[in-house]
Amino acid sequence: MALNDFHVSEPYTLGIELEMQVINPPGYDLSQDSSTLIDAVKSRLTAGEIKHDITESMLEMATGVCRDIDQAAAQLSAMQHVILQAASEHHLGICGGGTHPFQKWQRQEVCDNERYQRTLENFGYLIQQATVFGQHVHVGCANGDDAIYLLHGLSHFVPHFIALSAASPYMQGSDTRFACARLNIFSAFPDNGPMPWVSNWQEFAGLFRRLSYTTMIDSIKDLHWDIRPSPAFGTVEVRVMDTPLTLDHAINMAGLIQATAHWLLTERPFKPQEQDYLLYKFNRFQACRYGLEGVLTDAYTGDRRRLADDTLRLLDNVTPSARKLGADSAIDALRLQVKKGGNEAQYMREFIADGGSLIGLVQKHCEIWAGQ
């Protein structure tokens, strides 16, 4: 299958997608009623889009093209209000978090959607297990070559994005000992992790053509890489973050990615090389397992440094770009988070350590998303 031409978009514009949990009180397990909820909200939307994801316990909130994080926040806030209103009418709850802490994957119903049914046929039970919830951020690019450079540049900071957003310590009723267990779900997929090495858009088109020979790839959407180009939108899409518990944190993560993209494309601090990825999966694992307490290893020098320290360095590097984009509030909030030494996974464990239950944890997450 031929690859679409790269659509020219305004550099650094944003699009944000949030995969949300649809909850069934009072037991606070995942509901299988997302279709009912989506049908109820479609006519009420004034901006953005609310749509299905893989299973009937998920729904996706997606902004339109936004010039800055303030516009994105306004769209997401409006959608949040509409969804919460409809959820209340149908006696459902909505929350963030990268995993539901005690749902059973065997109970998950794949949406009655041609693409998802085809994916179920290809991947079997792996698709039901992929009832996990992430935040995706699109950043606009002027051309395909810029998109490939940006993808390689952002790949340096995949551990940082994972650690800052980690919100999935519990799965199937157990503490996984990971800060972000969500990404482990995709480890059995053949396209898990980083995109195979290419140096420009022409090479990427050749890569996509060869991947399509497998008959498992019909479009870019069928590729589950950590970061992928989206030629139809003219963007690079970062896909490694857990869905946050709050809209504010989702906006802060988007602001960081937007500012990092601006810094990368204006300063060009790296000359991408295939060896950059030599320790990619090791550093990614450190972020998933330990969050901000993880340790990064430099593929060239062997130097090791705390992820928290390197994240502060990233935040300092992108601060001038954030000011130009109106995203400095996001950088300030994330800097404070790192200095306090926590993420949402840590909060969840503290809730349980203080005597809370997993049912109570999901109830609390619904209250947090509703602003209670």
Swiss-Prot record:
MF annotations from Gene Ontology: ATP binding; glutamate-cysteine ligase activity
Alphabetical GO biological process terms: modified amino acid biosynthetic process
InterPro entries the UniProt entry points to: GCL_type2/YbdK_subfam, GCS2, Gln_synth/guanido_kin_cat_dom, YbdK
Record field: catalytic activity: L-cysteine + L-glutamate + ATP = gamma-L-glutamyl-L-cysteine + ADP + phosphate + H(+)
Similarity comment: Belongs to the glutamate--cysteine ligase type 2 family. YbdK subfamily.
Function noted in UniProt: ATP-dependent carboxylate-amine ligase which exhibits weak glutamate--cysteine ligase activity.
Protein's UniProt name: Putative glutamate--cysteine ligase 2
Organism annotation: Salmonella paratyphi C (strain RKS4594)
